[in-house]
């Protein structure tokens, strides 16, 4: 989520987020070129004093303004389709977690381990430390190992929710009575923040998500303390 003095996209913490950042830059370059061409054409038409009153058609210019948009769309569509395929790729996961949206907190279950279940509530503002973010800190962080394929299953117990962590390119709807899944891998240690991205009631803004990425050794130690 956006934090103080943070502009543009967040730093990617997964391979897919890095690919999406590259695609964003690629698309912005295409849009810049289109803006320059259209701006030059408009300026030329408005400022030139020369006109051709006898011109009835122009096959060349009609071919150009038909072909150029088609070529531009191809250059945007091909990497976009590749990313859509990668986002839906469900490779073998080493760890599976289940997150359940409730009004207004999250419940987590580590289904690969015994008795690893907990709830996460937003930390009140009067209990925050000086290095913690308002409306983004929780009492129990979700700890996961880095460089490990993780599958997250989402559901809800009451109304629609959405489990979203932008730095990991994750936004999975949590629907009552259904299980949705997403795959991701964290490639560096750190804290990654998210929030519920589906309006779910009065306290919708107070459902933060905090994922703590650690090494395998520290993750096993955390598991032993939770079990």
Curated annotation (Swiss-Prot):
Primary localisation category: mitochondrion
Catalytic reactions of this protein: 4 Fe(II)-[cytochrome c] + O2 + 8 H(+)(in) = 4 Fe(III)-[cytochrome c] + 2 H2O + 4 H(+)(out)
Keywords: Copper, Electron transport, Magnesium, Membrane, Metal-binding, Mitochondrion, Mitochondrion inner membrane, Respiratory chain, Translocase, Transmembrane, Transmembrane helix, Transport
Keyword tRNA processing recorded: no
Subcellular location: Mitochondrion inner membrane
UniProt keyword Transmembrane, yes or no: yes
Coiled-coil features, chain-numbered ranges: none
Mitochondrial matrix compartment spans: 49-62
Residues that coordinate or bind Cu cation A1: 161, 196, 200, 207
Gene3D superfamilies, alphabetized: 1.10.287.90, Cupredoxins - blue copper proteins
Cofactor(s) this protein cannot do without: Cu cation
Positions that bind Cu cation A2: 196, 198, 200, 204
Any one GO MF annotation of this record: copper ion binding
Record GO biological process: ATP synthesis coupled electron transport
PANTHER family recorded: CYTOCHROME C OXIDASE SUBUNIT 2, CYTOCHROME C OXIDASE, SUBUNIT II
Protein name, as recorded: Cytochrome c oxidase subunit 2
Source organism (scientific name): Locusta migratoria (Migratory locust)
Gene: COII
């Amino acid at each position: 989520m956006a934090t103080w003095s943070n502009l543009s996209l967040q730093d990617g913490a997964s391979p897919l987020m890095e690919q999406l950042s590259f695609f964003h830059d690629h698309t912005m370059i295409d849009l810049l070129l289109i803006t320059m061409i259209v701006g030059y054409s408009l300026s030329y038409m408005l400022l030139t004093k020369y006109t051709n009153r006898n011109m009835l058609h122009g096959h060349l210019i009609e071919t150009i303004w038909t072909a150029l948009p088609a070529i531009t769309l191809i250059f945007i569509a091909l990497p976009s389709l590749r990313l859509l395929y990668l986002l839906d790729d469900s490779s073998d996961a080493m760890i599976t977690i289940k997150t359940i949206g409730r009004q207004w907190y999250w419940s987590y279950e580590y289904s690969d381990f015994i008795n690893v279940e907990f709830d996460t509530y937003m930390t009140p503002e009067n209990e925050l430390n000086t290095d913690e973010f308002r409306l983004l800190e929780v009492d129990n962080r979700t700890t996961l190992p880095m460089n490990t394929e993780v599958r997250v299953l989402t559901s809800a117990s009451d109304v629609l929710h959405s489990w979203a962590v932008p730095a990991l390119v994750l936004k999975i709807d949590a629907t009552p009575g259904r299980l949705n899944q997403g795959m991701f891998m964290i490639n560096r240690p750190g804290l990654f923040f998210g929030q519920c991205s589906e309006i779910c009631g009065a306290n919708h803004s107070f459902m933060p998500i905090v994922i703590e990425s650690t090494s395998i050794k520290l993750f096993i130690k955390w598991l032993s303390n939770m079990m």
